[in-house]
Amino acid sequence: MAILGLGTDIVEIARIEVVIERSGERLARRILTDAEWAHYQQHQQPVRFLAKRFAVKEAAAKAFGTGIRNGLAFNQFEVFNDELGKPCLRFFAKAAELAEQMGVRHVHVTLADERRYACATVIIES
């Protein structure tokens, strides 16, 4: 295994809250997959949930070395938890194609939040 990419991101949770207050659920709908949207709607702290997902997806795009552009979109990355609660990442559409082209076989995700910030790191390996 070799590290193909590493990305990290930090998000000010209040910034996400302001966007939600201003534009309703448009940001969440743009960022989240259908499965994530279902969790978001049921979550006791939806702003924190969205901030953490945003951070993971930004970190993943950075790990790919592309950022969110050229057909890559936030909702092509899906954050889910394994049976032990560990965060994991699935790829769809252009993100899945890029992962295949790069030879991605393993993805490591960590995320955290504290009062004001959410942060995430993503490592992709061959």
Swiss-Prot record:
Matching SUPFAM superfamilies: 4'-phosphopantetheinyl transferase
Taxonomy, superkingdom: Bacteria
Record keyword Transferase present: yes
InterPro entries cross-referenced by the UniProt entry: 4-PPantetheinyl_Trfase_dom (IPR008278), 4-PPantetheinyl_Trfase_dom_sf (IPR037143), ACPS (IPR002582), Ppantetheine-prot_Trfase_dom (IPR004568)
Name of a matching Pfam family: ACPS
GO MF terms held by the record: holo-[acyl-carrier-protein] synthase activity; magnesium ion binding
Organism: Pectobacterium atrosepticum (strain SCRI 1043 / ATCC BAA-672)
Function: Transfers the 4'-phosphopantetheine moiety from coenzyme A to a Ser of acyl-carrier-protein.
Keywords: Cytoplasm, Fatty acid biosynthesis, Fatty acid metabolism, Lipid biosynthesis, Lipid metabolism, Magnesium, Metal-binding, Transferase
Annotated family: Belongs to the P-Pant transferase superfamily. AcpS family.
UniProt-recorded name of the protein: Holo-[acyl-carrier-protein] synthase
Cofactor dependence: Mg(2+)
Cellular component GO terms, alphabetical: cytoplasm
Enzyme class: transferase
Reactions listed under catalytic activity: apo-[ACP] + CoA = holo-[ACP] + adenosine 3',5'-bisphosphate + H(+)
Record's subcellular location: Cytoplasm
Keyword Manganese set for record: no
Positions of Mg(2+) binding: D9, E58
Enzyme Commission code(s) on record: 2.7.8.7
